[in-house]
UniProtKB/Swiss-Prot annotation:
CDD domains: IMPCH (cd01421)
Cross-referenced PROSITE patterns: MGS
Top-rank taxon, per record: Bacteria
Example GO molecular function: IMP cyclohydrolase activity
Protein name: Bifunctional purine biosynthesis protein PurH
Biological processes, Gene Ontology terms: 'de novo' IMP biosynthetic process
Annotated EC: 2.1.2.3, 3.5.4.10
Catalytic activity annotation: (6R)-10-formyltetrahydrofolate + 5-amino-1-(5-phospho-beta-D-ribosyl)imidazole-4-carboxamide = 5-formamido-1-(5-phospho-D-ribosyl)imidazole-4-carboxamide + (6S)-5,6,7,8-tetrahydrofolate; IMP + H2O = 5-formamido-1-(5-phospho-D-ribosyl)imidazole-4-carboxamide
Length: 529
């Protein structure tokens, strides 16, 4: 059953006023009486709409600088009153039924994001009346429609037109779910903010105690259900943060291809975040969340060609990310050369789509340009808990590098070392990356011992006929023994960049000197698990 409920009276009180005038006009044109408060009421009146101030309706003025506006029985009785059950008591107290509540809340998140936000500023942006009305209307969704998102305005009017001014129960229920999600997210933001302040509260809350609140409340919005998860017996869905600003897999738009799988999303994220490290035209090819080929060049076609040469076998069925617009020459080279699951770039030239359309299974994504990378949190689920840390946005400055070997690196060796250091940050530990002339030539990933990662990187380079002699090597963490240096020297590595910090650093440096290898310490580790 549709269980239609006509909309005769609506209360509008919004902080985000986008589209509210047009929505109110549409309601008024359909015979809906408008109640409103404060700034919303003034805006509607200035737009020549007939609107009744809530204070006139209740007979009680707004007070305490607007802190008390809608907390009144005539408001909440009108919202919570059960039609056909509470009619007599409502009439006795002159309470008019309110059939629709249109509310969004004080901008708490935007306020506390400002660098100069004080506790007093935050407190004044904690909405009280708004969430109370939202919850009241959502609770009584059997009779009342609650609207918290301006994106719903258009379809609400369309449904009213299709149902003689009424809304169906399914629509009211869907709106109620959105409302409870809205208030839950709002309260979570407030709890997280206060949880970061110096405990216990002694009046001095000017300095936060740290990045991590006492209770962590997370809110993500489901973007899509997935056919399955990492494996076919696992159910899965993809959730994203709200109000994202940085270009990412979460904000990307898909231009063609099948729906992204769980593994597609994880691998595309790895590829995109790696390619963001480079200023020059760059290409990153990823397989199973590990880069298998990375290169920079004068353009992305040259970068792709070099990245592919690192490991053509692993590149099959991989993910390709670029940091420049995808052009027709590069797109044609990809589809002529290999099977690829996903291509992601900031943009795609309009002439590229007909070329890619010949391979409809290729998922093509555009993510937009990016500037500075946004600080944030990374999460890792463990059984019974959640590990939380800052995103690894660290990248050592050249001025902080320390040459610890007798021989200093040449200009080209330093360039190669810095290149493969950027790549090593995105390779699963233990990570070893060989690079030469702006391209990776061997990557050893995920081994339990560092020396075996070094050996694997050398084997991969040899398998593809790539010249290791004179290349640079990056290690994501320090060498616990000299064996990794000996393995690198055996294949011709001439420069090594690594964090340093082992109790056997002297032994490791001695090994480098014995082999004539230049060694650079970064003082920064990049474990990735």
């Amino acid at each position: 059953m549709q269980q239609l409920r006509p909309i005769h009276r609506a209360l509008l009180s919004v902080s985000d006023k986008s589209g509210v005038v047009e929505f109110a006009k549409a309601l008024s044109q359909r015979g809906v009486e408008l109640l409103s408060t404060g700034g919303t009421a003034r805006l509607l009146a200035e737009s020549d709409l007939k609107v009744t101030e809530v204070s006139d309706y209740t007979g009680f003025p707004e007070m305490m600088d607007g802190r008390v506006k809608t907390l009144h029985p005539k408001v909440h009785g009108g919202i919570l009153g059960r039609r056909g059950q509470d009619d007599e008591i409502m009439a006795q107290h002159q309470i008019s039924p309110i059939d629709m509540v249109v509310v969004n809340l004080y901008p708490f998140a935007q306020t506390v994001a400002k660098p100069d936000c004080t506790l007093a500023d935050a407190v004044e942006n904690i909405d009280i009346g708004g969430p109370t009305m939202v919850r009241s209307a959502a609770k009584n969704h059997k009779d009342v429609a609650i609207v918290v998102n301006s994106k719903d305005y258009k379809k609400i009017i369309e449904e009213m037109d299709n149902n003689q001014g009424s809304l169906t129960q399914s629509t009211r229920f869907d709106l109620a779910i959105k409302a409870f999600e809205h208030t839950a997210a709002y309260d979570s933001m407030i709890a997280n903010y206060f949880g970061k302040l110096v405990p216990p509260y002694h009046g001095d809350t000017t300095q936060p105690s740290g990045r991590f609140p006492r209770t962590l409340n997370l809110n993500f919005i489901k973007k899509q259900d997935m056919r399955y998860g990492e494996n076919s017996h696992q159910d899965a869905a993809f959730y994203i943060e709200e109000n994202l600003s940085e270009s990412s897999i979460a904000t990307a738009t898909q231009l063609q291809g099948k729906a992204l799988s769980y593994n597609n999303i994880a691998d595309t994220d790895a590829a995109l975040e790696c390619v963001k490290e480079f200023v020059e035209p760059a290409c990153v090819i990823v397989k199973h969340a590990n880069p298998c080929g990375v290169a920079i060049g004068k353009d992305i076609h040259e970068a792709y060609d070099s990245a592919f040469k690192t490991d053509p076998t692993s590149a099959f069925g991989g993910i390709i990310a670029f940091n420049r617009e995808l052009d027709i020459k590069t797109a044609q080279a990809i589809i002529d050369r290999q099977f690829v699951e996903v291509i992601i770039a900031p943009s795609v030239n309009k002439d590229v789509l007909p070329v890619l359309a010949t391979k409809q299974n290729i998922r093509v994504l555009v993510c937009g340009e990016w500037e500075d990378r946004a600080a944030g949190l990374d999460f890792k689920r463990v059984n019974g808990g959640l590990l939380v840390q800052d995103r690894d946005l660290g990248m050592v400055a050249v001025t902080n590098l320390r040459v610890v070997s007798k021989r200093h690196p040449t200009e080209q060796e330093m360039k190669d070392a810095l290149f493969c250091w950027k790549v090593a940050k995105f390779v699963k530990s233990n990570a070893i990356v060989y690079a030469k002339n702006d391209m990776t030539i061997g990557i050893g990933a995920g081994q339990m011992s560092r020396v075996y990662s070094a050996k694997i990187a050398g084997i991969k380079a040899a398998d593809e006929g790539l010249e290791v002699q004179g290349c640079a090597m990056a290690s994501d963490a320090f060498f616990p023994f000299r064996d990794g240096i000996d393995a690198a020297a055996a294949v011709g590595v001439s420069c090594i960049i690594q964090p340093g910090g082992s109790i056997r650093d002297d032994e490791v440096i001695t090994a480098a000197d014995e082999h004539g290898i230049a060694m650079i310490f970064t003082g920064m580790r990049h474990f990735r698990h």
